[in-house]
Swiss-Prot record:
Xref: SUPFAM superfamilies: Trm112p-like
Cysteine disulfide links: none
Protein name as it appears in the record: UPF0434 protein ESA_02427
Record Pfam families: Trm112p
Family: Belongs to the UPF0434 family.
One cellular-component annotation, GO: cytosol
């Protein structure tokens, strides 16, 4: 994931900052507790494609 891209994209739900989880290849919105997938290196920033983060993932 290009760090320059991370600086300009935002969560489609709350417009908050997204964090890249390299291990899971997901963009994380901590505010909404959502994880957006990457497909072929392209972020899929659709709310219906996101998965809810588990309690363990939000409180490491």
């Amino acid at each position: 994931m290009d760090h320059r891209l991370l600086e300009i994209i935002a969560c489609p739900v709350c417009n908050g900052k997204l964090y890249f989880n390299q291990e899971k290849q997901e963009l994380i919105c901590k505010a909404d507790r959502l994880a957006f997938p990457l497909r072929d290196g392209i972020p899929v920033l659709l709310e219906n494609e996101a998965r809810a983060l588990t309690a363990e993932e939000t409180n490491p």
